[in-house]
Regions:
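Bacterial N-terminal signal peptides that target proteins for export
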Residues: 1-7
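Bacterial N-terminal signal peptides
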Residues: 8-17
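Cyclophilin-like peptidyl-prolyl cis-trans isomerases
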Residues: 19-233
Length: 233
């Protein structure tokens, strides 16, 4: 039996023994992210209420207006939300700023994971953040890559060593849609792009310096809450 099938069967055996049932993820709060590269809309999941409400609060307070996508890695992700990036000069090191608090992680595998277009919370590395608390303001949007079966099998082994299994749906998505599966179970996914995925593709392909900052600033000109779910604060 192929190794991926064995790993999937083991994963679902654990799921069933825990009494976990499949559930549909609602994505009802909508934020519009306006940038000088184009407009994106993100839906926020009600299944991650701490991150959902925090993102809505920051958007409503105009916290993100004027901030940069300060870290961009081709075929991986685009990251924004560092307070120090507003009007930052080209020689300023970005990415270490925060807004004074962290958020308890809200992992929800196998339902919320790092498919292409997923919205997730950035955080400090495990060495200084073993509990994997999320940044209170920094976020990233996944681009990633499409995985061939052999490459996917390698990722499955790596995740299995950490006690993380992927469902067949997740595997299919990573092979057909693309994403960053190695981040699953370590970073909180709390939303997804529902309009403007081509803008993510455009931004992730820009030229960057040795610190992964775009040579030409990519600015969040405005973030607007278009719709709030009935469960949001």
């Amino acid at each position: 039996m192929p190794i991926r099938k064995i790993l999937c069967l083991l994963f679902f055996a654990v799921m069933l023994s825990s009494g976990v049932e499949a559930k549909k993820k609602d994505k009802r709060s909508i934020d519009r992210i306006e940038t000088n590269a184009g407009v994106m809309r993100v839906a926020l999941f009600d299944d991650t209420p701490l991150h959902r409400d925090n993102f809505l609060k920051l958007a409503e307070s105009k916290f993100y207006d004027g901030l940069l996508f300060h870290r961009v890695i081709k075929d991986f992700m685009i990251q924004a939300g560092a307070p120090t990036s507003r009007n930052a000069g080209k020689d300023v090191k970005l990415g270490e700023g925060n807004n004074g608090y962290v958020i308890y992680p809200e992992f929800d595998l196998p339902y919320l994971y790092h498919w292409r277009g997923a919205l997730a919370a950035a955080r400090e590395p495990d060495e200084v953040n073993p509990d994997q608390y999320s940044s209170g303001c920094q976020f990233y949007i996944v681009w990633g890559k499409k995985y061939r079966p052999a490459a996917m099998d390698k990722v499955l082994f790596q995740l299995a060593e950490k006690g993380i299994g992927l469902s067949q749906q997740m595997i299919d998505d990573y092979e057909m849609r693309g994403g960053t599966p190695h981040l699953d179970g370590s970073y909180t996914v709390f939303g997804e792009i529902v309009e403007g995925l081509e803008i993510v593709e455009k931004i992730q392909g820009v030229q960057t310096d040795e610190r992964d900052r775009p040579l030409e600033d990519v600015v969040i000109t405005r973030m607007v809450v278009e719709k709030k779910s009935k469960n949001s604060r």
